[in-house]
UniProtKB/Swiss-Prot annotation:
Cofactor(s) needed by this chain: Zn(2+)
Full protein name: Glucose 1-dehydrogenase 1
Binding site for NADP(+): 182-185, 204-206, 264-266, 292-294, 341
Function according to Swiss-Prot or TrEMBL: Catalyzes the NAD(P)(+)-dependent oxidation of D-glucose to D-gluconate via gluconolactone. Can utilize both NAD(+) and NADP(+) as electron acceptor. Is involved in the degradation of glucose through a non-phosphorylative variant of the Entner-Doudoroff pathway.
Gene transcribed to yield this protein: gdh1
Chain sites annotated for binding Zn(2+) 1: 35, 60-61, 144
Amino acid sequence: MKAIIVHPPGAGVSIEDVNINGNGPGIKILENGICGTDREIVNGELSAATSLNGFLVLGHEALGILEEDTKNLRKGDLVMPINRRGCGRCLNCMLGRPDFCETGEQLEAGISGMHGFMREYINDDERYLVKVPDVIRDIAIMAQPLADLEKSIEEMISIQKRLHWPCIDGTYNCRKVLITGTGTIGILFAMLLKTYGFSVYISNKREPNDIESKIFDELSVKYKNLSNKIDESFDAIIEASGSGTDVIERTLPLLKNNGFYGIFGFEKTGTLNLTSEFLQGIVYKSINITGLINGQKPHMEMAMNHLIQWKKQFPKTTSMMITEKVSINNERRLKEVLSKKRPGEIKIKIIW
């Protein structure tokens, strides 16, 4: 079958015929999503990526159609595979939560230990499949990254139970959250935080482009240019830009006492200057800093439900989510979009 192949730790990408055997029901892949992790692997920038027998099938975002009945699913169902699998040894993995793997030996589809989903067919166990409602067929590919954010917000709220965090009226309306980064992840974080009732701010080191302005207007989120001085403080900050450690150094002091700082993704450049004064500020203000990564099956189901809700609540934004569709037969364009993000991009899909 045809597949998109990489050879980590080296750079480069190609479309090749491969023979990969698998267990479980067959799934015909209809489309894949492209994210920053895929591009880091293609460009040889992700040290965690590993080859299997000399190559690796790329991709951890996929939508497919089930080709046979299972215990709980039926032939013809739209399904999405979970991208992280357990090590099989630690307690969390054995209890279905490999997002908290204790050995660090979890498998990541299209990244390490497991071939990815950018291929014509896969076979997979039913327990790793999530049924996709037909009503969100056009934007369902967003559920995989959104699942990671569902888990992230769940984690933030759980951690902040260390104090009384809800407002006097029982909502989160009085809690201000700043998101750094206006890409796919930043926008999805903004939508999710608005759904939870937070007062949401989103930021970048520039002014918003036209598409971003339309989205932020519909979401009723406020915009901050990080190149300018920011005189406000926030109850939580989510770093979703992955641009450099200077963003963390710039925004961490903006947290209020008892604040939460979540880091999603990987900073590409820089060194964080942890002076004694910097660390004292974290201690005296009782700041919590948490790395945010990977949602599991319950979070993907939550993501599906939120996408259904948002098609009604935020119709303009959801209609702009898919920036481009690229056919697997257009190899030249495929290599371009797998290597570099285009300006104004939210999500690009590969169509099989």
